[in-house]
Amino acid sequence: MHTESTLDTTQADRTTLRPMRATDLPACHAMSLHLHWPHRLADWQFHHQVSSSWAVEQEQPDGTLNVAGSGMLCRLDDDYASLGLVIIADALQGRGLGRAMMQRLLADAGSRNVILNATEAGRPLYEKLGFVVTDTLSQHQSTTASAPATLPAGTHIRPLRPD
């Protein structure tokens, strides 16, 4: 059973770790866009459906609640799980929220071997939790130019076929 818990941070943080709701996904997606991650909202929705998903919620001075962190663990089978989409808002980093999120996700993994795809920013925390780098991946992103509105005379576009 998943329950909410007030995180052990300063009183001013007013944060809670709770199961993620579908209504949190646009805010999670916005956090990933802020980090220049390539995930679409549809990717977040898919991962939420197949994963144990958690959110850090922060109460603002006016009483409104904002999603300020995320993390997901997908159980691949009885032996393996994949952990990712771990984000803590910039303003809350360095307060132990990333560690609390990781501990919650690792508890959800149980005895499974956990695979973690992560950014360099989280590496110090992940290594403190026992993760070791086994390989690295470089990600390249670009924005594509729009196709011209009209094709030059005599130019045709057709489906590519093996014939």
Predicted regions and their residues:
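A short beta-loop-alpha structural element at the N-terminal edge
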Residues: R14-A27, G154-D163
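Helix-loop element at the rim of GNAT/NAT acetyltransferase active sites that forms part
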Residues: A22-L25, A30-A42
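Short loop/turn motifs at secondary-structure junctions and domain boundaries
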Residues: W44-V50
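Conserved beta-strand in the GNAT
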Residues: A55, G63-C74, A81-I87
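Conserved GNAT acetyl-CoA-binding A-motif
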Residues: A81-L83, D108-E120
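Conserved acetyl-CoA-binding loop-helix of GNAT-fold acetyltransferases
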Residues: I88, G94-A107, P124-K128
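Conserved catalytic-core motifs of GNAT/GCN5-like acyltransferases
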Residues: N113-N117, V132-S146
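Solvent-exposed, charged amphipathic helical/linker segments at domain boundaries
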Residues: A145-I157
